[in-house]
A protein has these predicted regions:
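Short, surface-exposed beta-edge/turn micro-motifs
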Residues: 28-31, 66-68, 82-84, 117-120
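Residues immediately flanking
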Residues: 36, 74, 90
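Conserved small/polar residues in nucleotide/adenosyl-binding loops
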Residues: 154-156
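A structural-propensity feature for long, helix-poor, extended segments
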Residues: 95, 99-126
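N- or domain-start disorder-to-order transition segments that initiate the globular core
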Residues: 2-53
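Compact, glycine-rich, soluble single-domain proteins
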Residues: 68-69, 79, 84-90, 94-95
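Well-ordered alpha/beta subsegment
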Residues: 114-150
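Short, well-structured hydrophobic secondary-structure segments
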Residues: 53-81
Length: 156
């Protein structure tokens, strides 16, 4: 019979604690651990102690995430979690748990019930279609309205 609740014989390194936040600080490029992809309704969250992904919330509506979502290693926001990052303009699915390089184009300030919960806005660093985007304002008024509306309905 299997022995349950035994300590692991090997330990997987927690990428949240060993990866650098910036890969190229002069160009605002950061490592990002992908938690969920755009067009999904389920919410996954990185467990900070282990670095594993956990299903945090099962989606119950047809309102899907309009962006890929993750966190930046070796950072902490005022809410005690790693800095959240939205990656916009992603056309192919990103694999949850994978690491991508993202170029920061801004920060949106949010208050989640009296708690600071800012969102870093970024594009994939190597996506040539996004080279002309230098600020999230370059994404247009509709993007800003869609994102603000979405985040007002879904607390992430």
């Amino acid at each position: 019979m299997a022995n349950l609740n035994q300590p692991p014989s090997r330990v997987t390194p927690n990428l949240l604690h060993i990866l650098n936040a910036f890969t190229d600080s002069s160009n605002s490029i950061v490592n990002t651990i992908v938690e969920l992809n755009s067009n999904t309704i389920n919410k996954y969250e990185l467990i900070t102690e282990t670095g594993h992904l956990k299903l945090d919330r099962v989606g119950y509506s047809s309102l899907a995430y309009p962006f890929a979502y993750g966190c930046i290693p070796r950072t902490w926001d005022e809410d005690g979690d790693p800095l959240d990052i939205e990656i916009v303009g992603v056309t192919e699915p990103l694999i949850p748990g994978s690491i991508v390089e993202a170029r920061i184009i801004g920060v949106m300030k949010f208050d989640d019930g009296g708690e600071v919960d800012d969102k870093v806005i970024a594009v994939l660093a190597d996506d040539k279609r996004m080279d002309h985007i230098s600020s999230f304002k370059d994404l247009g008024e509709h993007w800003l309205k869609e994102t603000t509306y979405y985040l007002s309905l879904i607390h992430i």
